[in-house]
């Protein structure tokens, strides 16, 4: 992986994998982390419901330029659902609007789960942050207003039954961006004929990131407090808490450019590269001494031709 954190700058640039706790909003945690690091730019890469916990990648500084690649990435979740009760929010925060007896068996569950593999269409819940005429749908829902929503195409890579009985079901789901786990549970409940709603939801992974690098808000606050005491090495200590910027695009192949090519790319010009590069997005890197530095994302628009797409500010490389 190319090196991308400049510890000599007066800014913090990188990605923190926050372990979101249940009951807090993603935006609240985003602003909390932004204040803790004292950065001007910060953004999360896909909100979690207040009920949910787990991985919430937060991009700081220059890393926000590449947040879309995490927003577009696939996600992994573990979810528990209560059977026999349907709520207006599709989760335990809502009002129970229907109760039905539960009469299910293993064969029935497995047959229904088979319908949730591959490409599926789902209608987003009314209690969501999707905008309609400039306002979030949940604001209409709270007033009892139902807005027609179009079905959206999502992809389920894997859905595994972890546990079930006549009161609950627990699943692990690997899905594409934009998938509403609450909707999957509500749909499963309807197909089972008993209704269901989410009681626990935890995000296990975003793209290639693993839980081992997650940190809770409390642990982060403690680590930052300690770092601030270690002047003049405060910035070094703070940056140790972060993943490098190019970790957001680690799935793209890296291409090393000459000094002349780097200069042209920074002017927005396309450059020639080896013909072995046929198409797709790449991480652009340059050598400085014995170290290779990441400085942006480019696209091979045709064999042997590289077009710059998103660059780090030069002072951060």
Swiss-Prot record:
Q: Which reaction does it catalyse?
A: uridine(55) in tRNA = pseudouridine(55) in tRNA
Query: Which cysteines are cross-linked by disulfides?
Result: none
Please name the InterPro entries in this protein's record: PsdUridine_synth_cat_dom_sf, PsdUridine_synth_N, PUA-like_sf, PUA_sf, tRNA_psdUridine_synth_TruB, tRNA_sdUridine_synth_fam1_C, TruB_C
> A Pfam family this protein belongs to?
TruB_C_2
Q: Which UniProt keywords apply?
A: Isomerase, tRNA processing
Q: Which CDD domains match?
A: PseudoU_synth_EcTruB, PUA_TruB_bacterial
Enzyme group, top EC level?
A: isomerase
Which PANTHER family would you find in this protein's record? PSEUDOURIDYLATE SYNTHASE TRUB1 (PTHR13767:SF2), TRNA-PSEUDOURIDINE SYNTHASE (PTHR13767)
NCBIfam families per record: TruB (TIGR00431)
HAMAP family, alphabetically? TruB_bact
Name the family the entry cites: Belongs to the pseudouridine synthase TruB family. Type 1 subfamily.
Write the protein's name.
Answer: tRNA pseudouridine synthase B
- The record lists the organism as Baumannia cicadellinicola subsp. Homalodisca coagulata
Taxonomic lineage? Bacteria, Pseudomonadati, Pseudomonadota, Gammaproteobacteria, Candidatus Palibaumannia
Name of the gene this protein is made from:
truB
């Amino acid at each position: 992986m190319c090196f991308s954190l400049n510890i000599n700058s007066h800014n913090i640039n990188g990605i923190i994998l926050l372990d979101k706790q249940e009951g807090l909003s993603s935006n609240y945690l985003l602003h909390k982390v932004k204040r803790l690091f004292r950065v001007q730019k910060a953004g999360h890469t896909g909100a979690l419901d207040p009920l949910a916990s787990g991985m919430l990648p937060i991009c700081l500084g220059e890393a926000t330029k590449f947040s879309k690649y995490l927003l577009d990435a696939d996600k992994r979740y573990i979810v528990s659902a209560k059977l026999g009760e349907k709520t207006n929010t599709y989760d335990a925060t809502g009002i129970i609007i229907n109760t039905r007896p539960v009469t299910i068996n293993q064969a029935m569950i497995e047959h229904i789960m088979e319908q949730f593999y591959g490409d599926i269409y789902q209608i987003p819940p009314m209690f969501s942050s999707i905008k309609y005429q400039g306002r979030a749908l949940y604001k209409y829902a709270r007033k009892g207003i139902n807005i027609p929503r179009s079905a959206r195409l999502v992809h389920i890579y894997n859905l595994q039954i972890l546990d079930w009985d006549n009161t609950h079901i627990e699943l692990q789901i690997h899905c594409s961006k934009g998938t509403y786990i609450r909707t999957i549970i509500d749909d499963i409940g309807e197909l089972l004929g008993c209704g269901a709603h989410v009681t626990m939801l935890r995000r296990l992974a975003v793209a290639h990131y693993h839980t081992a690098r997650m940190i809770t808000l409390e642990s982060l606050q403690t680590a930052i407090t300690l770092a601030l005491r270690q002047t003049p090495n405060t910035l070094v200590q703070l940056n140790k808490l972060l993943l490098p910027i190019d970790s957001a695009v680690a799935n793209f192949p890296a291409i090393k450019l000459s000094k002349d090519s780097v200069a042209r790319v920074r002017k927005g010009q396309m450059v020639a590269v080896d013909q072995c590069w046929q198409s797709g997005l790449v991480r652009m890197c340059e050598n400085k001494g014995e170290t290779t530095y990441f400085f942006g994302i480019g696209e091979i628009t045709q064999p042997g031709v590289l077009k710059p797409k998103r660059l780090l500010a030069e002072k951060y490389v």
